[in-house]
Amino acid sequence: MQENLVIVESPAKAKTIEKFLGDDFKVMSSYGHIRDLKKKELSIDKETLQPAYVIPKDKEELVKRLRENAKKADKVWLASDEDREGEAISWHLCEVLGLDEASTNRIVFHEITKPAILAAIENPRHLDMNLVNAQQARRVLDRIVGFKLSPVLWRKVKPALSAGRVQSVAVRLIVEREREIQQFKSEPYYRINAIFAITNADGSQSEVKTELDKRFTTHDDAIAFLEKCKDAEFSVANVTKKPLKRMPAPPFTTSTLQQEAARKLGFSVSQTMMVAQRLYESGLITYMRTDSVNLSSLCIGAAKEEIIKLYGEEYSSPRNFHTHSKGAQEAHEAIRPTYMANTSIEGTAQERRLYDLIWKRTAASQMAEAQIEKTTVNIASSKFDERFIANGEVVKFDGFIKVYRESTDEDAEQQDEFAHNLPPIKEGDVLTRREISSTERYSQGPTRYTEASLVHKLEELGIGRPSTYAPTISTIQQREYVVKGDKKGEERPYVIDTLRGLKITPTRKVELTGNEKGKLLPTDIGIVVNDFLMENFPAIMDYNFTAKVEQQFDQIADGKEEWTDMMKHFDQEFEPTVDKVMNARSEHKAGERQLGIDPVSGHPVFVKIGRYGPV
């Protein structure tokens, strides 16, 4: 007879864990939740707000097998993930399998490795009902909002629409950004750049590329400045050298992994999570839903050893980072490789690429700062007060840059063609003008969200948690309120006026502007639903309210608030608003516009909104 039954939520995780335990352990999978709310009913008691859970039909046979094995076992170990969702899965198992909460062992671990699993078996705990209740609060609140808002949309906007608490706020961000872009008026300005020559000690000449410290708002002013430069002499007013240190980025959290995998690998948010899940379940990385940047002392030690072996002692600089995001759980760890000695892995191309990114980010976080010398050269003329500035950087010691450099959404826009290595140069050096040019540029408006930048914004506002970012972004696209696509740019003329010798030559060019790829765009129906919810349910759509709800979930998880009290308070305010909007009379649905009167029938004629425009 088996003595121990271990239940996890995924078959891949079960397979990995089974390798680490003896013959007296059997590992089974629950395949996620074995109980949930009914799909087509509210399934929440109107008076008590208690949820009525059911076992879905497709889980009945599995539950039967789990019950049979639980009866045979001397001990049952519930080993679902260490977050609130995982705790709820364990609680549902406890309830459905008729397990005694006091004698059932709950085990948690950050990674699926033999030492971690054995340590968890040595240190079991009881179910944490605070975590379970925080999950129940989220599930019930989201069901109430979705179930009660959707019929309002059916009646007032269009049948078959749906709304969700976090998803609707995410759509609001995208709609508002689109409107900012439409309202933005780009203004021209003129940037002045110069290329000077300096004579070196051996008689050869080197180029010094510079930019003027002033921009002009009119073409006439820019040309007038070029005229002043015709008979101007130029010399170096001063040279400043400044040592800079660059720190490595902290190890990955869920959101930073999603953002960096999008920028560096081109992965969607959901793709990143699917690949990370496979790496975790194979025992290759730690748990992938986390908002902590902490590393275990074991990992810090292993990283130090690996860095010294691969790059040398001077590259090692062990450090721990501290988490600053709202609601972060310091007990958890950042996303890191389980074994730093594994610099690469076998697997699919996606798995190898994501693992490589995680390994490099973790290693870099434990490496020395990059030491850089920044040189700024001020170039003056007796003809005017403005200065030309040349910037140069020399990497004195590459440190963590040897392995990894963090990217940003603005990388492409911030590339400076006039930042370069400078030749030997000192105060008083006389420079020869080669060319000075005025380039017409335009002020840049806001850019549309990518999946990665939307995750960053949600995290910044305190909306959602590591487990909700990917589902939120998937849901708003599945509902077709938002589409991921490309925005075709427009051709825009601009002029470059170049002074060479005593002649100013204009060159007219055309550039493509506003061309965006893989951006989140609101659909027409997404805009209509957003505007309807903003007008009628401003509290639900408020960013601060949504962030406050997340904080209340955290309070419940910490045992500082009763989840049923939170639900009752919310429903008491929400229900009357729903009733008021539902019963309000209106001549036509949201998103419809009256075109005129039908001359035959005398009835008004409306244009209706479809998903992608008027119909």
Language-model segment annotations:
Residues 1-139, 148, 408:
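Intrinsically disordered, low-complexity regulatory segments
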Residues 3-5, 16, 150, 160, ...:
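Basic, low-complexity terminal or inter-domain segments flanking catalytic cores
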Residues 52, 80-82, 99-105, 124-132, ...:
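Short, polar/flexible loop-turn hinges at active-site or ligand-entry regions and domain interfaces
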Residues 112-196, 238-245:
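C-terminal or mid-to-C-terminal helical accessory/interaction module adjacent to the motor/catalytic core
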Residues 216-252, 426-429, 437-439, 548:
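Metal- or metallocofactor-binding catalytic centers and their adjacent structured scaffolds
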Residues 236-240, 247-261, 286-290, 445-457, ...:
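Short acidic, hydrophobic short linear motifs in intrinsically disordered regions
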Residues 258-260, 264-271:
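A conserved hydrophobic secondary-structure block that centers on an alpha-helix together
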